Design a protein with these regions (language model features):
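Catalytic core of nucleotide-activated saccharide and alditol-phosphate transferases
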Residues: 11-14, 102, 147
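N-proximal low-complexity "stem/linker" segments adjacent to membrane-targeting elements
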Residues: 2-67
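Active-site-proximal specificity loops/subdomain of glycosyltransferases
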Residues: 82-134
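Short, acidic, metal-binding catalytic loop of nucleotide-sugar glycosyltransferases
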Residues: 64-77
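Short coil/turn segments at beta-strand junctions that form active-site/ligand-binding loops
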Residues: 45, 77, 133-135
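Short catalytic/ligand-binding loop motif for oxyanion handling, primarily in non-cytosolic enzymes
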Residues: 58-61, 87-91, 144-147
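A structural signal for isolated positions on well-ordered beta-strands in alpha/beta enzyme cores
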Residues: 48-50, 78-81
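Short beta-strand-to-loop acidic/aromatic patch adjacent to the donor-nucleotide binding site
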Residues: 133-144
Length: 147
């Protein structure tokens, strides 16, 4: 398994055969210096669970997954919701009930479609927010953790 820092070092380099550099994608992602949200390790863990969220209206299925996953993972790992600036935290906090969630609010343009979301995930600036952890797990809301 590679550490997050190894991953970051690889992906901050040019994008290979596309002819684009990852700096081309950073126009859509706020760097840690440009956002007011500060996320920091709170638990004694090397791994951060990152949950992308883009709407205040999450389906019953997504609510069930979020509740289950934060109950299972929130005891041991820090959890961060990556979301647009205008997302209401109370929607997610009420589902997480008792598990502290951190929020990283990024420009809404990163969440308007598959291309902008993919570009955000390809951006080195996105991963700069998480350098305090050795590993990150990006956990989509359609995932249900068993065990």
């Amino acid at each position: 398994m590679h550490s997050f820092q190894e991953f970051y070092n690889v992906y901050k380099s040019p994008a290979g055969n596309t002819g684009e550099s990852y700096s081309d994608f950073t126009r859509t992602v706020a760097s840690p210096q440009q956002t007011n949200d500060t996320i920091a390790p709170k638990k004694n863990s090397e791994c951060l669970i990152v949950i992308p969220a883009y709407t205040n209206r999450i389906s019953e299925f997504e609510q069930m997954n979020l509740k289950n996953n934060v109950e299972r993972l929130g005891k041991c790992f820090d959890i961060c919701i990556v979301c647009p600036k205008l997302l209401r935290a109370d929607v997610y906090n009420s589902i997480a009930s008792g598990v502290e969630l951190q929020y990283l609010r990024l420009p809404s343009r990163n969440f308007i479609g598959k291309n902008s979301y993919s570009n955000m995930l390809l951006s080195a600036d996105f991963y700069k927010h998480f350098t305090a952890w050795k590993y990150i797990l990006i956990l989509q809301l359609d995932v249900y953790i068993f065990g």
